[in-house]
Amino acid sequence: MADPYRSNGSAAYDLAAGKLLFCHEIRLDLWQTVRECMTLFPDLTVEVQGLDAHYRFTENPAWDAFSDHNQCAHGLARPGDDLGPFLKFTLYGEFRDVTVASMFDGTPEEVRRMDDAEAQLKARFGGCCEVFRAATRIIDVHAKGVSKNRSARELQQRLGRKILVCMGDAENDISMLEGADWSFCPADGIVADRF
C-alpha cells in the first residue's frame, strides 16, 4: 500500500512521517494582506492557512463548527501572531451548514457578492497570487503558479513515482484530476459527472 500523502496545492505533507515535504509561500506581508481583506470584505470570513492550522481573525462560531466538522486544526489569531509561512488565504461566504458541500449553494445575491470579491482579489493580488473559486461561497488564494496539479506532479517527482494517481471531488480538483495519469472521483462528488 502506498504511503499517505496530502497536498492542498500550497504544501505537501507526508502523513505517516508527520513532516512537511514542500510548500510555496505567498510573497506578501501576511498581516497587511489580512487587514486589507478584512477592510475590503467585512461581510466575508477571512482565513489564513498555515502549516499547522487554519486561522481566523474575528469570533465566528459557525467557522469553528465548520472547521471542527471537516477536521481542520484551527484557531483565532491576533495581529502580530507568528502563523508561520504564508501559504494560502481564503474568503468564505456565510456558513449555513458544517459541510463543504453546502458551500456550493448560493443565492443569486451571494453569487454576485462572491463574483465581485473574486474580481477585486484578482485585480489587487493577481500579479503575485493565483485566485480561484473553490466553491460558490469559497475563494482561495495561493502563491503565483500554484495549482493542485503542479503540486501533485512535484510530489510524484520527489517520490520517484512513475504514475500519478489523484482523487478529488470538487471544482478546485479538476486540473489535478485531468492532469493525473489515473484519477478518481467519488460518485457523489460535485464533479463526478465529468469523470
Segments (PLM) and residue ranges:
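Hydrophobic packing residues within well-ordered alpha-helices of enzyme cores
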Residues: 1, 121, 191-193
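Short, polar loop motifs at secondary-structure junctions
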Residues: 9, 171, 187-190
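Conserved acidic, metal-coordinating active-site core of Asp-based
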Residues: 44-167, 171-176
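Active-site phosphate-binding/coordination module
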Residues: 1-62
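Structured helix-beta-strand junction loops
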Residues: 7, 40, 127-128, 179, ...
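Active-site-proximal flexible loops/turns
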Residues: 15, 176, 180
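Asp-based, Mg2+/Mn2+-dependent phosphohydrolase catalytic module
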Residues: 181-195
